[in-house]
Amino acid sequence: MNLKDQIENPTRNKIIKELHKSPMKFIAVITGAGTTAISDIMSLPGSSKTVIEVLIPYSKESLEFFNSSPLNKHVSVIESKNMASSIYIKGKSYLDKNEKFIGIGCTAAISTIPQRKGEDRAHISICNGDIIKSVTINLSRKNRSRLEQERIVSDLIINLLAESFDIDLRMNLDLYDDEKIIIHN
């Protein structure tokens, strides 16, 4: 997929327009990758009906706020769950009790210099108060640039928002054979 197609994806724009029509809203904490999803959502009219708040902590110290105790490993499913539930609780503290919203936590490690040990990946969790759904995407280091990895993580966030908002549209992520999405219970 070329860069122009990545930016001007008509399905993405349709999903975002549907998100903006929904009575649901979201509050998010995103680190490492996935912030392009927020840019995409806010680039179309209606985002004030959808977005409550977005935080982008980037240092380990700022991420500790979302974890009840220091983690041995950042960029993990546990961290994304902690982020989603913490930001959901924060939203509950100041929103009307009848407000319908979800909390999103995304933590990612994508292509960098120098190359890190371990896989390029993202963990995304969505909390609606009762349930936390989490997914992991393992990304291709050899086939994707950092920009392409950011795009894939962002599109996955938008797809998960669509699912959470009961919108039937999804983008095809065009994953390579060495990439996979894992759904956690």
What are these regions (language model features)?
Residues 2-171:
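Short alpha-helical segments enriched in small residues
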Residues 171-185:
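Flexible inter-domain linker/hinge segments
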